[in-house]
């Protein structure tokens, strides 16, 4: 692209699409120029003309059509000259039909003329060698420039040919345009000069150009200035759009983090209230059990004494009754005087008090404001802004400055997301009216009236670890299910989709990450899928003691029998997607797409034969195998040859058996600890880094996990619910 200050070259004009019509995409024919300076073929413009108006196909400017039609639009002699040069260069082929001399037929020679070897740039004629040698021997042609025809066709003399080229008069063929009629602003040849323009003042073309060039150059300079301003404005508009997108991304992050922290606080309050309720009910049940035991004992004693007295009175003889009268009367008086409280003991019934503001549709925990930012044009102001801080920081309408991530009073995490329990007044800045802000403050303070004593999650090293962002949650039970789902396997299934192995309902269900049900992959009759992995257009799963490979229509490609020494067999797809690994009684077997055994190894080598039991298995993008070893009660990481890269069996497992494992795109390992409702994170070599998910995140008996697209951790719970968390990396 030619810059504003530089002049375009002739080569660029001839080689670019400048000479092509933007309508028919062919070389211009009878070029006509519109007032907007766009040039098209005359026939193409005639097809676009609608009545008295015509709209330019490029700039969409509407121009009036002259009464005489599109033929009356100004002829573009500049384009005509370039087209003549291009046609002259392209005329004839030196290898096929050689061009003939243009002078030989005029001098009475052969009718066709000899083969041309040269060209006169002034006459625009091809010449044979003889005519070329004598062409400059006359007074009229002495100054003509005769050049080699091959070099002319190659473009070596384009500049000279252009300088010596003369525009031809459209009214008088063969006559060059030589004059400019000043009153009519029309180009004239000698014949035109002698007819209607004889009395008009005319100037030679060179003199007319010298007179009019300064005015055009001045106008061009003004347009160049406008172009510079337009370019600066365009760049400023792009920068403003980039700032808008950047700020929008920040707001999205703030909304996600604020929502996450509010959800955490709400879940903590949920656990706290449920704990209090559980403790109250257990204490009440314990007291009730003690009272019921005492009452049942007293009731049994009284019932037995009363039954004995009734038998004596109804069946005994007079002497027998009188002999037992004293003992019976004493016992009955004793039972009547036994202390007991009629009616049930006082019981405190629990009642839930829900803050009414949360159900109010006008209660906005998140509120968005838009601040207009004036453009900065003064470079001095820009410099002051760069030295004195970020002056483009948005302010609210009442002049209060929005907190920045660089403020020293808060960490970046705290400055981006404020929960009601931390700072009830922080949210007040988003309102535009003071009474609304005070009302909103009061709502948030009411919510945070009593801080929750429930312990939060273990965030040891959280500033250095990937962080979870809650994405969505959905159930997996479908209307056709006969039993409650029991999810035993998960795997990614294409982009943003998961495949769920429901062993209880003997189904492989497809869900999007948003929880939309996408149907099911049919499984063979009687199969209950346990572990599942997706390969290239196929699905591998284990059921009982068999490994199956099926296509998406449920057709079995092959099946392999596995060892019966293991209750379940974990299945994992290799990163290449063309092999599947399965854990079989302490070792790992890898099968290719044809069902042939590609390799088999024991983690740690043959010395560990019989010492391993991999219940869960996955692979990393780096090609490593990661498994949960229930016999060693450890998490083991090994390479493709079975060499152990790392193994963890430390206190971070809390004495639990390691559960399901998943690996993100950077190699971080996510290990499920079902007994303590946790998912911990380990580095690619198996060293524990800290907790990733806890009951604080809503985990309740997590069963299996998988990683989708390397950044979404999908966790299934024992009740058939699936939670999806987005893994925020360190460099986010």
UniProtKB/Swiss-Prot annotation:
Compositional bias segments (type: Basic residues): 434-446
Pathway(s): Protein modification; protein ubiquitination
UniProt xrefs under Pfam families: zf-B_box, zf-RING_UBOX
Broad EC category: transferase
UniProt zinc finger (B box-type) residues: 164-205
Enzyme Commission (EC) number: 2.3.2.27
Zinc finger (RING-type): 21-60
Subcellular location: Cytoplasm
Protein's job: E3 ubiquitin-protein ligase that plays a key role in innate antiviral immunity by mediating ubiquitination of CGAS and STING1. In response to pathogen- and host-derived double-stranded DNA (dsDNA), targets STING1 to 'Lys-63'-linked ubiquitination, thereby promoting its homodimerization, a step required for the production of type I interferon IFN-beta. Also mediate monoubiquitination of CGAS, thereby promoting CGAS oligomerization and subsequent activation. Independently of its E3 ubiquitin ligase activity, positive regulator of TLR3 signaling.
Family: Belongs to the TRIM/RBCC family.
Name this protein carries in UniProt: E3 ubiquitin-protein ligase TRIM56
